[in-house]
């Protein structure tokens, strides 16, 4: 089996990366950073996001597994003292994969109707470069509202525990193929009105965001911050691709949520 290891870059993570590589090579596995079948992410959720984007062009051929070396990583199943157990599992145990939905973001520009396509594992946020964001929000081709406020966040089910949660959005189980639209500090008064609640859009619905005046946007795709100029529209929907995580032992989604936000309790 071909593998690659991605590290956060700190001393602890780099040391673990070297150990994991050495152990797996001892089991006659092949280190291949271009076309790995499994990618071990050592660090936190940011490290896994980096690995996801690096291999986003081969998601149907690559599975991910996380080892967290700092605070609890939401995407990580393993801790540093378990790496020998993890290596044995990778080398000796047939694993199954779980698939999570992704967010597709298509930015269309006025010039020649040019398009750029992105995939997000967690979320996409859209903000104006200066002042409030003013944009029409269309759902499934129909005008839903004109938004005025700080910005908009569109998240995946697995990303619903990240920025979306801080905005008051719901936590969605990743077995549900949907995206969530949450508002950032919307302006609501007698003149301007928005729905004021997060919206859950199924896989056959898309969300189109069209600027009313400002055409330069700051768009984030997970950990990436991008400046887009002369934007005509931004379309978001559930992607056809899915991310695959290698599972060597049960770790239910709601258990992850409990451990991350509530703790184990007494």
From Swiss-Prot:
Family statement drawn from the similarity comment of this UniProt entry: Belongs to the NAD kinase family.
Record carries keyword Membrane: no
Entry function: Involved in the regulation of the intracellular balance of NAD and NADP, and is a key enzyme in the biosynthesis of NADP. Catalyzes specifically the phosphorylation on 2'-hydroxyl of the adenosine moiety of NAD to yield NADP. It can use ATP and other nucleoside triphosphates (GTP, UTP) as well as inorganic polyphosphate (poly(P)) as a source of phosphorus.
Gene: ppnKA
GO cellular component: cytoplasm
Cofactor annotation: Ca(2+); Mn(2+)
Family annotation (Gene3D superfamilies): Probable inorganic polyphosphate/atp-NAD kinase, domain 1, Probable inorganic polyphosphate/atp-NAD kinase, domain 2
Assembly mode: Homodimer.
Binding site for ATP: 150
Temperature dependence: Optimum temperature is 35 degrees Celsius. Half of the activity is lost after treatment at 40 degrees Celsius for 15 minutes.
Lineage: Bacteria, Bacillati, Bacillota, Bacilli, Bacillales
EC number(s) reported in the record: 2.7.1.23
Residues that, per the record, bind NAD(+): 45-46, 122-123, 148, 158, 161-166
Protein name: NAD kinase 1
UniProt cross-references to Pfam families, sorted A to Z: NAD_kinase, NAD_kinase_C
Inhibition and activation profile: Allosterically inhibited by NADP and activated by quinolinic acid. Strongly inhibited by HgCl(2).
